[in-house]
């Protein structure tokens, strides 16, 4: 019975990690699109501000690009060092 509980925890964790990674990728893609579109709108309105706008775009795009990698690190932690398994084993008295 205990093995089934542990397997259920790993299965739920795998599903959760998949959803989290998909959401992080989708959020990053939407963020990239918004950043680039607003930068192009700003350049179209004020072409002389192009260098400043491009600098800001690359800074914020770098921050946006780092978000999925941070989420990936948390996902790997949940997959390989799952804190819920230890809690379940303690609750079951193993």
From Swiss-Prot:
<comment type="function">
    <text>Key component of the F(0) channel; it plays a direct role in translocation across the membrane. A homomeric c-ring of between 10-14 subunits forms the central stalk rotor element with the F(1) delta and epsilon subunits.</text>
</comment>
<dbReference type="InterPro" id="IPR002379">
    <property type="entry name" value="ATPase_proteolipid_c-like_dom"/>
</dbReference>
<feature type="transmembrane region" description="Helical">
    <location>
        <begin position="58"/>
        <end position="78"/>
    </location>
</feature>
<dbReference type="InterPro" id="IPR035921">
    <property type="entry name" value="F/V-ATP_Csub_sf"/>
</dbReference>
<comment type="subunit">
    <text>F-type ATPases have 2 components, F(1) - the catalytic core - and F(0) - the membrane proton channel. F(1) has five subunits: alpha(3), beta(3), gamma(1), delta(1), epsilon(1). F(0) has three main subunits: a(1), b(2) and c(10-14). The alpha and beta chains form an alternating ring which encloses part of the gamma chain. F(1) is attached to F(0) by a central stalk formed by the gamma and epsilon chains, while a peripheral stalk is formed by the delta and b chains.</text>
</comment>
<feature type="site" description="Reversibly protonated during proton transport">
    <location>
        <position position="65"/>
    </location>
</feature>
<keyword id="KW-1133">Transmembrane helix</keyword>
<keyword id="KW-0812">Transmembrane</keyword>
<dbReference type="InterPro" id="IPR000454">
    <property type="entry name" value="ATP_synth_F0_csu"/>
</dbReference>
<dbReference type="GO" id="GO:0045259">
    <property type="term" value="C:proton-transporting ATP synthase complex"/>
</dbReference>
<comment type="function">
    <text>F(1)F(0) ATP synthase produces ATP from ADP in the presence of a proton or sodium gradient. F-type ATPases consist of two structural domains, F(1) containing the extramembraneous catalytic core and F(0) containing the membrane proton channel, linked together by a central stalk and a peripheral stalk. During catalysis, ATP synthesis in the catalytic domain of F(1) is coupled via a rotary mechanism of the central stalk subunits to proton translocation.</text>
</comment>
<comment type="similarity">
    <text>Belongs to the ATPase C chain family.</text>
</comment>
<dbReference type="GO" id="GO:0033177">
    <property type="term" value="C:proton-transporting two-sector ATPase complex, proton-transporting domain"/>
</dbReference>
<keyword id="KW-0138">CF(0)</keyword>
<keyword id="KW-0375">Hydrogen ion transport</keyword>
<keyword id="KW-0472">Membrane</keyword>
<keyword id="KW-1003">Cell membrane</keyword>
<dbReference type="GO" id="GO:0005886">
    <property type="term" value="C:plasma membrane"/>
</dbReference>
<keyword id="KW-0066">ATP synthesis</keyword>
<dbReference type="GO" id="GO:0046933">
    <property type="term" value="F:proton-transporting ATP synthase activity, rotational mechanism"/>
</dbReference>
<feature type="transmembrane region" description="Helical">
    <location>
        <begin position="15"/>
        <end position="35"/>
    </location>
</feature>
<dbReference type="InterPro" id="IPR005953">
    <property type="entry name" value="ATP_synth_csu_bac/chlpt"/>
</dbReference>
<keyword id="KW-0446">Lipid-binding</keyword>
<dbReference type="InterPro" id="IPR020537">
    <property type="entry name" value="ATP_synth_F0_csu_DDCD_BS"/>
</dbReference>
<keyword id="KW-0997">Cell inner membrane</keyword>
<keyword id="KW-0406">Ion transport</keyword>
<dbReference type="GO" id="GO:0008289">
    <property type="term" value="F:lipid binding"/>
</dbReference>
<dbReference type="Pfam" id="PF00137">
    <property type="entry name" value="ATP-synt_C"/>
</dbReference>
<keyword id="KW-0813">Transport</keyword>
<protein>
    <recommendedName>
        <fullName>ATP synthase subunit c</fullName>
    </recommendedName>
</protein>
<dbReference type="InterPro" id="IPR038662">
    <property type="entry name" value="ATP_synth_F0_csu_sf"/>
</dbReference>
């Amino acid at each position: 019975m205990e093995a089934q509980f542990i397997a259920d925890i790993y299965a739920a964790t795998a599903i959760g990690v998949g959803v989290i990674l998909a959401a992080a990728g989708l959020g990053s893609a939407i963020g990239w699109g918004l950043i680039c579109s607003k930068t192009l709108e700003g350049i179209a309105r004020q072409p002389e501000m192009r260098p400043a706008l491009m600098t800001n775009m690359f800074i914020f795009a770098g921050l946006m690009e780092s978000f999925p990698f941070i989420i990936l690190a948390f996902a790997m932690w949940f997959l390989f060092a799952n804190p819920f398994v230890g809690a379940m084993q303690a609750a079951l008295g193993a």
